Amino acid sequence: MEIRRFPAAEAVQGVAVDEAHVYVVASRAIGKYDKTTGEKVGEWTETEQGPILHLDSGVIVGDRLYAAHSNYPGIPMTSSIEIWDRKTLEHVGSHSFGIYRGSATWVDFHDGFWWVAFAHYGGRSGEPGKDPSWTSVVRFDEHWQERGAWVLPAEVIERMTPFSNSGGSWGTNGLLYLTGHDRAEVYVMRLPTAGSVLELVDVLDVTTPGQGIAWDRSGQEPMLYGIDRARREVVVFAPNQPE
């Protein structure tokens, strides 16, 4: 169920959220907005010749904003996690994966681990010989050492094709919520008890056509934040949470 929405010029790729602010992510810019009023209170913009090319979904962990970054639509795909001070929006760090499993599209921190999706695409944005079925969700420890990886089930890949997994955020119910690039749906996933394929629990209909999402876990009632890219708006939901 949609609760509210407000305009944000950076509503192109994704969002991150903490107890007081929403961080709205464009490819090379971030806007910081008051969560209650929707007023813009800060921003960061990459320089014309700067190294940050294509930011995507983000997450707040402690005093830092972490965002997935890639050279999309470049080939070969390269990826990194870029880091900002959430108070000042000063860029303070980077972890580079180099050429790895694909194009990093979202990052989250859950159950003591980092989780990152590495997307693959169809058409001209894809790597030769690979398609969206090569997309994976990878678990890392605090030192960014890989500690497990999973792929998406065929029925979810079919709904995302020719694009891929754009957003992801862990719910307080222990389930993983994923989005594609253009469909107004959220895919609720569970880690399998065996094998390498995530289990599809539910498909939620929403009013935002894909892109990055973030659970606001700071209050008693968790809220899901997303963006309406066409309207350049941040959208807040109170969806049902399956168990």
How would you describe each model-predicted region?
Residues 3-28, 54-57:
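Beta-strand-rich domains and repeat architectures in extracellular enzymes and scaffolds
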Residues 3-10, 45-50, 95-100, 150-162, ...:
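Surface loop/turn motifs at the tips and blade-to-blade linkers of beta-strand repeat domains
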Residues 13, 68-78, 117-134, 236-237:
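Short, conserved, GDST-rich strand-edge loop motifs in beta-rich repeat architectures
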Residues 196-218:
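Conserved blade-ending motifs and adjacent loop-strand segments that build the rim/top face
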Residues 21-24, 65-66, 114-117, 175-178, ...:
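Conserved beta-propeller blade signature
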Residues 78-88, 131-144, 186-193, 239-241:
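Beta-propeller blade signature
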Residues 152-192:
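Loop/turn-rich, solvent-exposed surfaces of beta-rich toroidal or solenoidal domains
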Residues 39-73, 78-79:
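Blade-loop segments of beta-propeller domains
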